[in-house]
Amino acid sequence: MKPGKLNWEDLKELIDENRGFQREEVVLHSGIGEDCAVINFGDYDCVISTDPITGAGKNIGKLAVNINCNDIASSGVEPIGIMVTILAPEGTTLEEIKALMQEIGEEAARLNIEVMGGHTEVTSAVNKMIVSCTIIGKGKAGTSVATSGAKVGDDIVVTKFMALEGTSIIVNDHEQKVQEFLTEAEIIEAKGFTDYLSVLEEGKLAGELGVNSMHDITEGGLLGALWEMAKASQVGFRVFEEKIPIKEVTKKICSSFNLDPLKLISSGSMLITMQQGERLVKALQQKGINAAVIGKITEGSGILVKEGVEQEVPPPQRDELFNL
């Protein structure tokens, strides 16, 4: 098999055939596009998610904390703590592990969450450092937002700019290559995108405004996230390429490496659906967060309108990052 997430058909089969015993306390179960599980504990819900970092070589501690917190943010609740598993290859020094944990601890402190535990080992089973985290959030019972809540007629809103994470990974891990076509200022700008990977603020605001659906845009990029949201909600969508916010340095990098920015890992951006999406856009912009309405939730299939031509969006394959 090639690197990357399993295709949706294989993943759905694995999920559907291996659910174990379904507990009544679990109010949001596993499914395509659902990154979180929700467990009811009376007046409050516990929201849990887990994700590894596998495609990056640098800033993996910072990335691991943010992508997991973003899953919780997409439910519109507050992250409380994180558990960290580190698998280090043979030859890793104690100083390298300490530096990684320091990065994780500093990012967790910045986001007001606690590192509650985990596991660390050196193993021949991996050839580079792997970090996998489980994040726990808390919200009032019945208030969490699901990926599967999108409704026909909803506006589709995205926050910040697409492929911030993918752009920063490429520049940090392949700096010598990008120096051939990027200026020093562009390289500094792209590296700085790691400071914009959290979607906690927009997730909290969107939850307060009563949106129908949220999904953080990660592996597979915007088109992958749209497809997953539509599949989970049993709806279609129609989005317009010219309305999708993408930084010029990202366009330049993707053009040079022949990558599609709409299929490139995009932590730092949230996909949201609701009625009167411009109301959310205005509220986000008042807090200094870029946002745009890029289309509508529809019946039928998912459509990308590109230069006036309609293209049906297929199920997501592996992320463009793995095509480098």
PLM regions with names:
Residues 1-56, 75, 84, 106-108, ...:
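Extreme N-terminal cap/leader segments of soluble proteins
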Residues 3-10, 285-324:
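Acidic, Ser/Thr/Pro-rich beta/coil linker or hinge segments at domain junctions
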Residues 28-31, 47-49, 114-118, 157-159, ...:
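General beta-strand structural signal in soluble alpha/beta enzymes
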Residues 40-53, 78-175, 296:
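Glycine-rich anion-binding loops of enzyme active sites
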Residues 57-82, 102-110, 198-208, 224-228:
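Small-aliphatic-rich amphipathic alpha-helix that forms the alpha element of a beta-alpha
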Residues 89-91, 190-266:
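Active-site-proximal betaalpha loop/short-helix elements
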Residues 134-146, 184-206:
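Active-site glycine-rich loop that binds ribose-phosphate moieties when present
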Residues 273-279:
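Helix N-cap motif at beta-to-alpha junctions
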